[in-house]
Amino acid sequence: MSQVRLVLIAIITSCFSTISYAQTKILFDASKAEAAGNADWVIDADAHNIGYFNGPAQIGGTESNAQKIPTPLQATITTSTAETYWMGGISNWGIDCVKKGYTVESLPYNGAITYGLSSNTQDLSNYKVFVICEPNILFTTAQKTAMLQFVQNGGGLFMVCDHGNSDRNGDGYDSQMIWNDFMTNNSVQSNPFGFSFDSLDFSQTSTNIASIATDTILHGPYGNVTSIDFNGGTAMTLYPSVNANVKGVIYKSGSSSTGNTNALMVRSRYGLGKVAAIGDSSPADDGTGDANDVLYDGYITGANGNNRKAIMNATYWLATNNNLTGISDNETTLFNIFPNPAQEELTIIPFNEIKSGTFTLANILGEEIISENLHGQDRISVNVSSLSNGIYFASISSEGYKSTQKIIVAH
């Protein structure tokens, strides 16, 4: 290969790796009765004056009414700020995000879940991550579409569920039912993320961690996750045939750590975005918040601090590199692509000889278009002349590593 070609490859790779997607802003939902009953899954509430009477929130009650901007202002938070600085059952999560350098907001009980609506100052397009901790109100068709478009276009969605029969506002729907309805009953794509929540209720501390050395959720900046503590939670079933990107990272005790059932924590990709899901809200509970609720610290003391590690590593994974490449920060780069954008043919050049592996090309929905086994090739030629213009993802998996890069087809 000529030096000129090597330089071109380096320039192209560098350009794509530095494109920014958006500010690092995280939105915590408070519009789906997250503070109903004995829950208080908000990062901060200055007022406690709403109630849930078999449905949405209404003024007249004692539940947390989270405002858009937490107070005191997050600019005053330091590395030593305690979680009681804000008043909410998941304030520690929010304050940890601020300490990491993120900006956090709450979507109030009367806020709107939209995508691409410029008149909404809290439109999801303004955020990198959307956290929904145990929703208790069904999403509307329009809200489902907005959330799926948010993920498709590079956003990160953190889905927190709870055990079956945990309807807190008395409307007949619990978080397991609501999340499954979101994924299976929408106008965009059925089961887009490749998993569903089971209707279970169990408690355990599990050390059944998937063996994935490069996984950011398990081995991220907050440390190595060695266990997780559930107190009344549920598990998930995976469907890799629907979305090959889905992966269980923590499993129920006694289950296979590589299987498709009994997953306690899951990650997936959809379009350019990412999804993280956990089957219990108690790991996020920091034990302080609404004085009318009985809260327990699962965030710091749960599983000897591992609950916090898992949640913050997952938040970091969702927030980082949600850019136009759509590639995880922890994936090992195994190859270069030339040219990119491409018109007729792509050349994939592995950095080292790949004795055994797989090359795949997928569209923006994660649907596999091309798959080829690799056996020592020094380069791969891919004809893209018949593909529609747009964004695609080229991946090479080899010896336990997977590298993915975005390509653009432009005829």
Give residue spans per PLM region.
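Active-site-proximal beta-strand/loop segments in catalytic clefts of secreted hydrolases
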Residues: 29-32, 107-111, 132-136, 160-165, ...
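Helical hinge/lid and interdomain linker segments adjacent to catalytic or ligand-binding clefts
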Residues: 74-180, 185
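Hydrophobic/aromatic beta-strand patches that form the interior of the parallel beta-sheet core
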Residues: 27, 105, 158, 191, ...
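Bacterial Sec-dependent N-terminal signal peptides
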Residues: 1-24, 367
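An acidic, glycine-rich "communication" segment
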Residues: 62-64, 68, 163-261, 267-270
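C-terminal outer-membrane/trafficking sorting elements
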Residues: 330-411
